[in-house]
Amino acid sequence: MNNPDRLEEQIGNIECYRGVMLANHTSILFSNEPDISLLNNQGTTVGIIEVKGGADPAGALERYGAAKKSFEEGLRRNSDVRTILVASCITSEVDNRIKTDSTISAYFNLTEILSENSRQYDQFVQEVFSLLPAE
């Protein structure tokens, strides 16, 4: 039975929920920096995702720099961590920098991964869940 009062209480405490533990005891955590952390079943961070949703091309380089800073910190803590950038605006300049940037393991266009019928969506899901194996 659903209790609407309980639901309101849970929604009121939404800031307390930082993530989810999957059935295989891996976790997906949400925070300010990095935006998303992927933890294996030992609690080790194996992936970091930065989401940059700004659509203004003039700010694309700044958003890339902010993501890079977060990735550098994650790599400083664990040199084996995979870093994934998800951005809605990747200019040609940012694209060129990403392609030569060793701190970024993979990157995806936010608009394209929001469509379940896109190849980018499939690649993104595969990338994330390859870090959180079901074993």
Task: Please give the residue ranges for each predicted region.
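Catalytic core segments in nucleotide and nucleic-acid processing enzymes
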Residues: 2-135
